[in-house]
C-alpha cells in the first residue's frame, strides 16, 4: 500500500485528548494515523482505534522507534510492545525516529534490525525520519533504497529542505512532511492569507495542499473537530503556478525542530 498523502499526526497529544482526536478523525474519514514510541500515546491511539470500530485493514498506522531502542537486541522487542499497545498484529509503517546520537548504534545495525522486523511481518513497510543526505546514503547502503518507504522530515513553507528532497527523489525515497504548518506560524503569513482568500480556503488548507501538490505526505494534528474536518478538505484544493511560486519564495531555512544532543548535522 502506498503511503497515504494525508494522515493524522498525534505529536504532543495524550490520554483523553488523543483518544478524542483519533476517534473524531476516524469518524470524519481519516484513515492514516501517525504515532511514535516517545509520544507516550500508542496505547491511547490503540484504544481510540478499537472504540472507533473501523476495520484494521482500512487503516494505515505508522509508529517510530525511539533512540533507546535502536540496537539490534532492543528494536524488535520494542516494536512488539508498540503493537501490543496499539492492539494490532502489525503496523503499516515503522520509522527510525531519529538517527542514533553520536552514531552509538550504527545505521547499518538499526536498519537491518528494522528490515528483519519487516521480514517477520511486524511492519509492512520501513522508513526513516530526520535523516540527512549522508545518513540516507548509509541507510541505502544497509538495506537498499527499495526498502525505505519514506523519510519523514520537518518541511514547511519556511523550511523547504530542497537539498534533502531532491536527493531523496533522485533515489526513489518518498517524503513525508511534519510540522507542515510551522507550529501555526505559517498560518499568519500574508502571502498564504492572500492565496487562501483567492481560493476561498483556509491558510492551513493552502499549506497542506501545497505540500501534497509537491508530492509529500502530510500528517497535521488537531484537537478541534472543525479543524480536523477543514484540513481534510485540503485534498481537494488545487493551487496554480502563481501560488506555488509565491510559496516557494517563502523558504528561509527556518528550522523549528532541532533538539540538542539528538539532531544530526543538518544539510
UniProtKB/Swiss-Prot annotation:
Keywords: Cytoplasm, NADP, Oxidoreductase. It is an enzyme of class 1 (oxidoreductase). Its EC number is 1.1.1.-, 1.1.1.346, 1.1.1.2. It catalyses: hydroxyacetone + NADP(+) = methylglyoxal + NADPH + H(+); a primary alcohol + NADP(+) = an aldehyde + NADPH + H(+); 2-dehydro-L-idonate + NADP(+) = 2,5-didehydro-D-gluconate + NADPH + H(+). Induction: Expression is not significantly altered upon methylglyoxal addition. One of its GO terms (biological process) is methylglyoxal catabolic process. GO terms for molecular function: aldo-keto reductase (NADPH) activity; aryl-alcohol dehydrogenase (NADP+) activity; methylglyoxal reductase (NADPH) (acetol producing) activity. The keyword Transport does not apply. CDD domains: AKR_AKR3F2. NADP(+) binds at residues 179-231. PANTHER family: 2,5-DIKETO-D-GLUCONIC ACID REDUCTASE, NADP-DEPENDENT OXIDOREDUCTASE DOMAIN-CONTAINING PROTEIN. Belongs to the aldo/keto reductase family. This is Methylglyoxal reductase DkgB. It comes from Escherichia coli (strain K12).
Amino acid at each position: 500500500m502506498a503511503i497515504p498523502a494525508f494522515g493524522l499526526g498525534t505529536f504532543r497529544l495524550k490520554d483523553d485528548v488523543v483518544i478524542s482526536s483519533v476517534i473524531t478523525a476516524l469518524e470524519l474519514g481519516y484513515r492514516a494515523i501517525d504515532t511514535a514510541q516517545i509520544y507516550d500515546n500508542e496505547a491511547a491511539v490503540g484504544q481510540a482505534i478499537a472504540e472507533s470500530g473501523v476495520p484494521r485493514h482500512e487503516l494505515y498506522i505508522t509508529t517510530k522507534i525511539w533512540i533507546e531502542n535502536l540496537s539490534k537486541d532492543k528494536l524488535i522487542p520494542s516494536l512488539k510492545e508498540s503493537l501490543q499497545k496499539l492492539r494490532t498484529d502489525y503496523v503499516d509503517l515503522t520509522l527510525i525516529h531519529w538517527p542514533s546520537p553520536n552514531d552509538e548504534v550504527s545505521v547499518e545495525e538499526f536498519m537491518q534490525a528494522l528490515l528483519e522486523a519487516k521480514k517477520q511481518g511486524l511492519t509492512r513497510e520501513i522508513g526513516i525520519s530526520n535523516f540527512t543526505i549522508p545518513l540516507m546514503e548509509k541507510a541505502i547502503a544497509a538495506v537498499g533504497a527499495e526498502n525505505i518507504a519514506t523519510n519523514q522530515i520537518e518541511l514547511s513553507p519556511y523550511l523547504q529542505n530542497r537539498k534533502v528532497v531532491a536527493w531523496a527523489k533522485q533515489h526513489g525515497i518518498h517524503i513525508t512532511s511534519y510540522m507542515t504548518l510551522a507550529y501555526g506560524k505559517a498560518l499568519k503569513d500574508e502571502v498564504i492569507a492572500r492565496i487562501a482568500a483567492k481560493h476561498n480556503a483556509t491558510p492551513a488548507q493552502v499549506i497542506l495542499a501545497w505540500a501534497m501538490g509537491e508530492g509529500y505526505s502530510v500528517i497535521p494534528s488537531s484537537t478541534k473537530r472543525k479543524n480536523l474536518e477543514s484540513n481534510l478538505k485540503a485534498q481537494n484544493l488545487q493551487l496554480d503556478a502563481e501560488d506555488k511560486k509565491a510559496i516557494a519564495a517563502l523558504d528561509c531555512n527556518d528550522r523549528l525542530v532541532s533538539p540538542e544532543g539528538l539532531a544530526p548535522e543538518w544539510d
